[in-house]
Amino acid sequence: MLVSLTEEKTYKMLVEKMDAGESFIGEDILLEFTNYELLHGILTCSLPISLLFPAFLRKRKTELCYKLALAEAALDTDGEYLRKSSRISYLDSAEKSMISYYLGNFFTFLITRKLFDTEYLLHLNYMRDGQGNAYDSAGKKKRQELIGYQKEQDAWSIWEAKGRSNNMKEAMEKGCSQAGEIGNVNGKSPVLKAVCMTYYERGYLNAKIQKESRQGDIGLDFSKEAYIREYYRSIRELFLEYYNCENMRDLRLCGIDFVELLLPVPYFLEGQSLQETERCICIGMPRNFIEREESPFWIQEHLEELKKELGESSYLGRDGIYVRKALDKKNELFL
């Protein structure tokens, strides 16, 4: 069946976790997640290609629509499981590789939050070192892709996101080699270095995680404040594209001022909807995050209260960004 990530649904996915080294027997996990959790991962996954283009009207909405269209076009559902869609079978191998790369990133963002409590994940391309130089390359093999941060432990992690059609040992080995080159982030040893790869097994989408124990001699040095600012940059710009428009509303949750954006997006595939040409994604974040770029960590003290107030048809990340079932301005559900 067709995937529509704006429709409320719980999915399942087999994830294999492997420790460092080849002798470790993997631990299989049946990961459950909702469409809202996956939407949150797609929303917060800011890919480096966006840095190529200057700002233009509705740039961030265009990016989000593109990412959403790729995910929905590439995948079908079989009950609660996601599988490879025959729609992409005619594509050139390079085009398929590009789609696999995007899926690998989307699900790495989802999995690191679900299984490793990583609140923040950002591509290294967005960061600059203490001298203001971009991290175009940080090692012999290739630039390491993703830097994770956990506020409670004040800990950094290194992640390589891979997306493949098959379970490729070579891709995992290359990812481990890349991650292993990093010795420290801002003077601290990473608490975790790992590769997360999505692939298809008998047509079903699976994921594999392999940890890396090697300690390289490369150090990454950047401002934590700049890291957090860059993490929220694409979401802030999405909200600012619609600021003071009728698509936005103010609301107060647990005594905190939020701004909620009702973002219309098209149905991309024939058959996704028999009547409508458009649906909505409802995204919210604290007003202070948008207007003043202030440190967001205080929001974590209110997470449980906020989750109760938002209800079941939603997902609130530890980053303070939520996705929920679309509501109109009278607080009535869009159906």
Language-model features: where?
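Conserved catalytic cores of phosphodiester-cleaving nucleases, focusing on short active-site segments
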Residues: 145-150, 154-167
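Interdomain/boundary linker segments immediately adjacent to catalytic/signaling cores
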Residues: 31-111
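Extended, charged low-complexity segments
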Residues: 211-335
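Catalytic cores of nucleic-acid endonucleases
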Residues: 109, 163-226
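A short acidic/basic microdomain associated with nuclease active sites
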Residues: 114-138
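N-terminal alpha-helical "arm" segments
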Residues: 1-31
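Short, surface-exposed coil-to-beta transition loops
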Residues: 140-144
